[in-house]
Amino acid sequence: MARYDARLRGIGKAHACSAFAGHDFEGRNIMKTPWKFLAQLASRRRSASVQENFIAPDTDPEVIESETENKSPLPFDKPTQASGTPDHDSAVDRGSMLSDQLESDPNPLQEMNLTADIQEPGTPARSETKQSDAAGKRLGPQSQTSANSQKKPEIRCRERSKNARAEGVAQSAVATNEAETVQTSSSGDPFFNEVAILDEEIKELRRLLAQKLYLQNAQLKKMLERFDAS
């Protein structure tokens, strides 16, 4: 046992010395120069940074969102391409229909002009109806004002005719009174003359009173007509 322990101790010392000297247990030279050591450190750092750059885009959520946003518009571009085909097909169909119409109808332009010119006799044009409506709206207030103006002259003419009649009656009464006074003055009795004069004055007063009453009635009628018109 003592011998075995001594051997182990000797082997350990030899291994420690060889490691310190830069040799492994088998005796190979493992010492490294400082330049090699620095080169290995730099290569390790570069490899670590490259791995981080490759791994970071996969794990960063912001980068993932940006990639999804950039990729999302791609499916929406397909409907535009698909929508372009129906337009082209519709244009082709229209062209074929027009060509068929041209072949079937020798003079399509003449028929189009005839259909545009022909209108129903009972239905007037829209422009004419609009003009007639505008003219009716414009003439509406004018017709009302003209009707009111026509009514006013008629009322005035009636009033003037009534006044003229009253004046004619008064003048005839005055003429008869003058004739009677001439006849009484020709007679020689003074009593009869005074009685005749009094009768004439009474008649004159009655005439004036009747004339005033007539004028007052005419004024009242005017006021009532104005009140009704308002």
Curated annotation (Swiss-Prot):
Keywords: Plasmid, Signal. Residues 141-150, 173-188 have a biased composition (Polar residues). Residues 1-21 form the signal peptide. Residues 47-190 are annotated as: Disordered. Residues 151-165 have a biased composition (Basic and acidic residues). It comes from the Bacteria. To R.meliloti RA0936 and y4aO. This is Uncharacterized protein y4nF. It comes from Sinorhizobium fredii (strain NBRC 101917 / NGR234).
